[in-house]
Structure formats: C-alpha cells, structure tokens
C-alpha cells in the first residue's frame, strides 16, 4: 500500500475539517443569531408570509449563512433541500444544516453530466460558462429538479419556498420542475433588468403563465406568490 497516498488523504480530510470550522465559527460566527441572512431581507419576507414551518428548495445555495435565503427559515424549524455545484459548499451545509438534504449536483433540463469551470486561485465558481479566467474544470452530474427531489424523502411534497440563484440558468431550473406535483407556493429568482424592463424577461413571462403574482422586488431578486 502507498503510505504517502493514505497520508495525503488524511491531511486533506483534516484540512477540510479545519476550513469548515474556521468558515462557520470564526469567519461567519454561526453561533450568533441574526435577524436576516439574505441579501435584502428576502428570508424575513418569506418567513412573515407563512404561519407554519414549511419545505424549501434552494438551488445554487452556495453557503448556509452568507447571503442565504433559507438559513433563517431553517432556524425557524423549516427543512428542505440545498443543491450546489461546489463540493466544499455542500460539505459545509452537511455540518451547518444536518437536518436538510444537501446535494452536490447541477440542475438541468435532462439527466447528464456538465463541465463545470472554476478558478483554483479564487475558489470554486457557480458558473457553468467557460471563461478565459476560469481555466480549470470538473465533470459533475446533472438532472432535472423534479427528478432530484424525487430521490429524497421530500418526494411529491409541495414546495413552500423555491429559491434559485444559478447565474443565468434560472429559466432552465424552472422548466425542469413538474409544477403539477411540486407547485411552489412562493419563488425567489434573479431577474437582471434589461433595457426593455423585467416584464419582458423570460423568467417573468414563464411565472406569469404559471399563475404567479409578483409581490416583492429585493434588488435583483424577485419574489412571486402562487395565486389561489
């Protein structure tokens, strides 16, 4: 057996542990309660809309504390699914959100594999787009959002809050969900205003056709509620 190989694995394991400890307890102070964890109060808005704890799905979750729309919900007894391309992000979620289902995958229109570009110097990027300044890549599994949910304990449970932040792939995430089965009660999604205005955006048009009502705008994040 190669002793150096096993020694390297042990070192990497402990380095990851210390990184996660530093990130959660020193850098982001997980033990300190905050009134808001999202970028512009999206989490507070959603929490006030629901009287009882619900079920969330966070696609492009990135970090359990930093600019996260679901951590405040988790602290208020909500539970859900967190999905991200970044392996380290999911390991941090497994520590900080042990009662959630945390998945290292990409969401796409069909099952397959995706080439995922990142920068070794800056850390993993959530972009699926090839950039000259992101020369390194991994191959990651991808699937439809409804198929991913189907493989969890939340199968066929209606989504109370769907949060999407996937750098321009938001419409693909929405199209990969079976709205008849999962039918989210509320959705937070990025819409970058074009010169024509947000009402011309494909995400806005898609959700309006699905019988959603725009109820709030938090910077580039738009919150929609399903009409009764």
Each PLM stretch: what is its role?
Residues 1-228:
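Phosphate/nucleotide-binding beta-alpha loop and adjacent structural elements of enzyme active sites
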């Amino acid at each position: 057996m190669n002793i150096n190989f096993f020694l390297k694995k042990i070192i990497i394991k402990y380095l990851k542990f210390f990184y996660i400890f530093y990130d959660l307890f020193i850098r982001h102070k997980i033990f300190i309660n905050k009134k808001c964890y999202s970028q512009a109060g999206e989490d507070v808005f959603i929490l006030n809309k629901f009287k009882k704890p619900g079920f969330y799905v966070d696609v492009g979750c990135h970090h359990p504390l930093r600019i996260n729309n679901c951590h405040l919900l988790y602290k208020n007894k909500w539970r859900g699914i967190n999905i991200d391309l970044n392996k380290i992000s999911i390991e941090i979620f497994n520590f900080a959100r042990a009662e959630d289902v945390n998945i290292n995958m990409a969401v796409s229109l069909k099952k397959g594999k995706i080439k995922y570009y990142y920068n070794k110097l800056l850390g993993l990027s959530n972009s699926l787009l090839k950039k000259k300044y992101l020369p390194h890549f991994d191959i990651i599994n991808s699937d439809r959002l409804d198929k991913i949910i189907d493989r969890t304990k939340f199968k066929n449970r209606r989504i109370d809050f769907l949060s999407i932040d996937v750098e321009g792939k938001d419409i693909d995430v929405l199209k990969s969900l079976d709205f008849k089965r999962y039918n989210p009660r509320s959705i937070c999604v990025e819409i970058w205003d074009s010169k024509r205005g947000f009402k011309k955006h494909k995400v806005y048009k898609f959700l309006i056709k699905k019988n959603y009502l725009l109820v709030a705008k938090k910077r580039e994040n738009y919150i929609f509620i399903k009409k009764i």
